[in-house]
């Protein structure tokens, strides 16, 4: 671990303590003329880094992969994954972990360069990234952070001065991603597929030490590890559902063991409430539709449980039973998180038998009348009537009376209920059309002011500020569905 005192780099790379089959050491591929286009000042400070130093040419070279900070140990991680249900051996095909930054408070965060060049896992890809998708990940990951949803974060984006070729010629870029770690369900699948129980134990022990040290002394720490990951994912997916976030590519290599949201390729936020909403251009069967996300999370976690079977118990039948028992708990945990979150969105402090039907009735009406998900809860929070089909319907008026009656039966005042709603119903989300508007200005016109204004608004989604109102407006009706792409 080496500290550069001027900038604040304080890097280690504990991942190299794992067997070498889990990674390949490889330097980034230099680029011709890097330019810093976005730096996350507040994140830099929390990591113990000095923003003004990071803007200097020598530090920009680090974000571009043209230089390495003291203590860096670049490597590409190996992992596997079920991609749309099909198992593949994978790995970092266009990203490098350069090290782990130890913060002033002693926390450890991966520093990864995304778009840093080809690796042994590139599978004929160029290892590069385009500017638009990297800025998109920056915007949405920071919006998720502001929404209090566990997520990887974005420290910087640099342009490379080189073209990247996808369907068309695009400006190249590199994103510096920050994560609690990049250990995935797919990392455990990779270990299990290779067949070495010792390697699998090494990975599990490393993961426990890094993310769940409180279970190190547990009688069966590998069962406890599975339990903890299930708990975190149940909470995470409920938080996605509560704000209308659709990940789009919930492959097992995109499910983190830390419980953070990762990979913002084809993700988007729902406008009109619909359980079947899909944005990803490659999800033609709706596998990862909004309403399917809890089920797909359970499916992914079952793949983790399968991978752990060799170390859950020496008797395979008993190990299988343990795995099945633990996975069966996910749905109950998820439902509890979701129900509690929905109650908060409606200002309900206590629990009554009719709360679940009250919630379900509202959601059915929202789907029937194609109501905007975020704005419906925003209007309820403000106790305002919108000029929409939902609010003008007789069903809604009847429902509203039931809801108001329910609020009156609480010990807490209506003012307290509305305050809780305000803290749980975001006034704004990164609406797809506003994100596209910001990306178009930045990528096509080299105008980052639109993105900066959007990021400022998204940084406090529960403020209910008049300055944010323009970002509350849904997109104009269109016959063309919004489509997202993975960026690779």
UniProtKB/Swiss-Prot annotation:
Cofactor(s), names only, from the UniProt record: Mg(2+); Mn(2+)
Molecular function (Gene Ontology), one example: AMPylase activity
Active site: 253
Pfam families documented for this protein: SelO (PF02696)
Catalytic activity, reaction form: L-seryl-[protein] + ATP = 3-O-(5'-adenylyl)-L-seryl-[protein] + diphosphate; L-threonyl-[protein] + ATP = 3-O-(5'-adenylyl)-L-threonyl-[protein] + diphosphate; L-tyrosyl-[protein] + ATP = O-(5'-adenylyl)-L-tyrosyl-[protein] + diphosphate; L-histidyl-[protein] + UTP = N(tele)-(5'-uridylyl)-L-histidyl-[protein] + diphosphate
Presence of keyword Nucleotidyltransferase: yes
Domain of life: Bacteria
Binding positions for Mg(2+) per the UniProt entry: 254, 263
Keywords: ATP-binding, Magnesium, Manganese, Metal-binding, Nucleotide-binding, Nucleotidyltransferase, Transferase
EC number(s) recorded for this UniProt protein: 2.7.7.-, 2.7.7.108
Annotated function: Nucleotidyltransferase involved in the post-translational modification of proteins. It can catalyze the addition of adenosine monophosphate (AMP) or uridine monophosphate (UMP) to a protein, resulting in modifications known as AMPylation and UMPylation.
HAMAP family in the record: YdiU_SelO
UniProt name for this protein: Protein nucleotidyltransferase YdiU
Gene: ydiU
């Amino acid at each position: 671990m080496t500290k550069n005192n001027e900038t604040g780099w304080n890097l280690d790379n504990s991942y190299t303590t794992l067997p070498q089959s889990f990674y390949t050491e490889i330097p980034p591929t230099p680029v011709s003329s890097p330019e810093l286009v976005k730096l996350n000042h507040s994140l830099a400070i929390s990591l113990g880094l000095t923003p003004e130093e990071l803007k200097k040419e020598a530090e920009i070279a680090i974000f571009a992969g043209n230089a390495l900070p003291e203590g860096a140990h670049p490597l590409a991680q190996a992992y596997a994954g079920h991609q749309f249900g099909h198992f593949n051996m994978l790995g970092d095909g266009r990203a490098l972990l350069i090290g782990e930054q130890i913060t002033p408070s002693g926390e450890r965060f991966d520093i990864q360069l995304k778009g840093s060049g080809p690796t042994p896992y590139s599978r004929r890809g160029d290892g590069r990234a385009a500017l638009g998708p990297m800025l998109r990940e920056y915007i949405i990951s920071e919006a998720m952070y502001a929404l209090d949803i566990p997520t990887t974060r974005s420290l910087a984006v640099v342009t490379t001065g080189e073209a990247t070729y996808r369907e068309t010629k695009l400006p190249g870029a590199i994103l510096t991603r920050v994560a609690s770690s990049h250990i995935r369900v797919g990392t455990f699948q990779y270990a299990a597929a290779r067949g070495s129980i010792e390697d699998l134990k090494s990975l599990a022990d490393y993961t426990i030490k890094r993310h769940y040290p409180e279970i190190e002394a547990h009688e069966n720490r590998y069962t406890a590890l599975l339990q903890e990951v299930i708990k975190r994912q149940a909470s995470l997916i409920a938080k996605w559902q509560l704000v209308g976030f659709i990940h789009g590519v919930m492959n097992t290599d995109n499910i983190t063991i830390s419980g953070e949201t990762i990979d913002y390729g084809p993700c988007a936020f729902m406008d009109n409430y619909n359980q079947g909403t899909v944005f990803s251009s490659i999800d033609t069967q709706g596998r990862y539709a909004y309403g399917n996300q809890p089920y797909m999370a359970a499916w992914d976690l079952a793949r983790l449980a399968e991978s752990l079977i060799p170390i859950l118990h020496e008797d395979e039948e008993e190990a299988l039973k343990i795995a099945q028992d633990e996975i069966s708990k996910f749905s109950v945990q998820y439902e509890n998180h979701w129900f509690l979150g929905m109650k908060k969105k409606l200002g309900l402090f206590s629990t009554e038998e009719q709360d679940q039907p009250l919630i379900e009735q509202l959601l059915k009406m929202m789907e029937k009348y194609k109501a905007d998900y975020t704005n419906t809860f925003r209007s309820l929070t403000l106790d305002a009537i919108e000029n929409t089909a939902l609010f003008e319907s007789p069903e809604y008026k009847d429902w509203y009376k039931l809801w108001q009656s329910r609020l009156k039966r609480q010990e807490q005042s209506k003012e307290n209920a509305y305050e809780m709603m305000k803290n749980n119903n975001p006034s704004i989300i990164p609406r797809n059309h506003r994100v596209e508007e910001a990306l178009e200005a930045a990528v096509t016109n080299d105008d980052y002011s639109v993105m900066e204004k959007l990021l400022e608004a998204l940084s406090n989604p529960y403020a209910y500020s008049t300055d944010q109102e323009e970002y509350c407006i849904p997109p104009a009706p269109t016959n063309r569905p919004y489509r997202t792409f993975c960026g690779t």
